[in-house]
Amino acid sequence: MQPAATTCTEDRIQHALERCLHGLSLGRRSAPWSAGLCLNCWSLQELVSRDPGHFLILLEQILQKTQEVQEKGTYDLLAPLALLFYSTVLCTPHFPPDSDLLLKAASTYHCFLTWPVPYCSICREMLTFIDAELKAPGISYQRLVRAEQGLPVRSHRSSTVTVLLLNPVEVQAEFLAVADKLSTPGQSPHGTYTTLLLHAFQATFGAHCDLPKLHRKLQSKTIEELEDIFTETTEAQELASGIGDVAEAREWLRTKLQAVGEKAGFPGILDTASPGKLHTIPIPVARCYTYSWNQDSFDILQEVLLKEQELLQPGILGDDEEEEEEDLEMDRHCAERDSLLSTSSLVSHDSTLLLTSSQASEPVLSRQMLTTFVSGLSDGMDSGYVEDSEENSEWPQKPGSQKRQGHRRPGQKFNRFYKLLKSTSQLVLRRDSRSLESSVDPTLPLRRAGSLCSPLDCPAQLPSRAQRSRSLPQAKLTTQLPRWLLAPPSHHQRRRPFLSGDEDPKASTLRVVVFGSDRISGKVARAYSKLRRLETSHPILTRFFKLQFFYVPVKRSHGTSPSACPSSLSQASPLPADSLKYPSPTDLGMAPWEDSTNDISHYLGMLDPWYERNVLGLMHLPPEVLCQQSLKADSRPLEGSATQLPILADMLLYYCRFAARPVLLQVYQTELTFVTGEKTTEIFIQSLELGHSATTRAIKASGRGRKRLGIDDDREAVPLTLQIIYSKGAISGRSRWSNLEKVCTSVNLSKACQKPEELDSSMEALTLTLTEVVKRQNPKSKKGFNQISTSYIKVDKVQIIGSSSCPFAVCLDQDERKILQSVVRCEVSPCYKPEKSSLPPERSFSQPAETGSDLCSLLCLPIMTFSGALP
């Protein structure tokens, strides 16, 4: 009976795996239905987690599928299989000593190194991940949980914070309830330490570790004792992962952990003679903060600094970092800040001198990035920054070796001689910097010029422009941040690219998860552009966090029925736990929201099939299904080991943990000229509506006024005479300009790629939709109407001018709050990074002379996906 049961289990797991991979090829668009496919991955994880032995069965079948992929050359399945293998190894309780699964996996993925990018990059990271697991079993699990829970361990101080941003008026109540549950504190620090120690000992000793007895022993310990045991365990694992020989590393780690257990008072629990039973230890829920967000800025993210300042503040330094600080103490005030995003070194230098006080000093923060398969960002990010290579990693000790004391890197002696030979001009510059610094009042509050968040009852006069700080978006929040956080980084701090693949390996990670439709994606693009501009002049968030943006599409709620969910419309406070009612648009005197598209998420799904399956597919299921928990009761014997979450919460955490490759979405800018002659520049990412379509959206959003104004379609709209100048890009990089005059009711711009066959990474374009009036009929007895025709043109730049200064309306990204009236001129072009933002827009319309540097400086919004843009 036992072999039959095993065969049945293998068949069930194999069937669940095939369902996960079904329809993932790029030619998969023939299927007219997709509802329920997003649950296949969750169902597979649920099935495997019921028994610790199921993980090894699934890993065997994943490797068999991967070998078939290599033989058949089916590129599309490699990334999903690698992700499934990684997540399964992460949750596997223990690999038996006689198991060769990881060695077979290393041999299998080594054969894919000759495949094109990103497949070779995925396999290279898989090999690094497998090597670490072979030497120190369970180390990837430890690193992930340690970072997500914010547990500092001496030199390993990396932290991962997840922030959920959603608009409660537009998102369904079920999504709000799930977000509120994720942001509710789960395990206590005592419980987290216990879980990590249980996992570490079981991963090393396997069934020979009496886990229930060890659990009771750990629960009787104080949190200080658990922290000491956890610190020794972590140091041992990190050192073992750096040993060259796999067998030597595993044996040394086993001996070291056994010594740690004996020291902690665990006799007869570790390495028992008779094997017991393995237990599945799920990953604890990550720390999450939930905020109500409906702004065009990420000012709210700075509240994370207030919550995480205990982890970010200086205090625990490694030996090498303390020596570097001593070596470079004499350089603390010399040389201007060369910010990685600065538009001008002079502006950056001035802002540094104004904000530095004599007491402000910031040692290098000690952090370590999660070095796993999903750790790095892909190549080709929009940073354009390359930093000098430098040996900055701590080499692990060999077994039996003494702890390194006073060791310095080989280049430090040369650096000391270099500092002694510096010219006296830098000493003069340093004295000048100190004199300027001493002249600044350290108690002067930081304010942004013209900030709308400034208190109205402040009687003090605004400081002069030279004394204002343009670094922080909110004055109130600025006064709450500690002085060490606001101080400019010292000269010796290693510069870190902004959202780049060259991130500092010790940086903490800030996951920003945004829920919404294309309207919200436009807000994300505008907030991202402002964030880059602010971080250019005075980096705050990017000094401590590596930013990652995640996008979860949802259907826009019409708000026609009251929903029971937490109530707080504050933009600067997390959603509370009390159950009240959010006001709907009707309660606010507004019309119900008009439907918004989800073209951005569909575009991401075309580029990454695993994103389409596991993230975009959530939109096709009813919210009540996504909020259900597992039908199987939790039978885990360890109390408090994990908290059961709804399906939606599990999928959100899966997306945040395993999506590590960004897709770059081109951001566009439009310069608008009004009837009064004033000009303004706005940002959009998906669509721009002009004329009757924008006016109609404004009328629908006007609340009670929509009944009085009425809504006409394009056949009854008043036509506009427009001069349209557009540029059609070519693969060669040349542009062909056209100038025409049209009588139109509406002119719309949207992202060109709507079908899989239109995917082409070398051609980023917009679709110009012209609703042209062919003939206007004005009968005497009835209202006039138009005979219209619609044409589509792919463009990369366009200029629209109202004839005889005829005004029109413009709407950005289907946002009712971004409708601008009385516009007479609209110029649209790709948006550049802040370094290129000073270029006059007219240059792009006069002579389309483009250089390679301009093409590299385009501003793109990076949205995290699982595999990035597949070729």
Swiss-Prot record:
It comes from the Eukaryota. The modification Phosphoserine is found at residues 451, 500. Keywords: Acetylation, Cell membrane, Cytoplasm, Membrane, Nucleus, Phosphoprotein. Greatly activated by G gamma proteins. GO terms for molecular function: 1-phosphatidylinositol-3-kinase regulator activity; G-protein beta/gamma-subunit complex binding. One of its GO terms (biological process) is phosphatidylinositol metabolic process. Residues 381-413 are annotated as: Disordered. Its main location: nucleus. The modification N-acetylmethionine is found at residue 1. Residues 25-101 are annotated as: Heterodimerization. The keyword Nucleus applies. GO terms for cellular component: centriolar satellite; cytoplasm; cytosol; membrane; nucleus; phosphatidylinositol 3-kinase complex, class IB; plasma membrane. InterPro entries: PIK3R5/6. It is a peripheral membrane protein. Residues 646-746 are annotated as: Interaction with beta-gamma G protein dimers. It is found in: Nucleus; Cytoplasm; Cell membrane. The heterodimerization region allows the binding to the catalytic subunit. Regulatory subunit of the PI3K gamma complex. Required for recruitment of the catalytic subunit to the plasma membrane via interaction with beta-gamma G protein dimers. Required for G protein-mediated activation of PIK3CG. Heterodimer of a catalytic subunit (PIK3CG/p120) and a regulatory (PIK3R5a/p101) subunit. Interacts with beta-gamma G protein dimers. This is Phosphoinositide 3-kinase regulatory subunit 5.
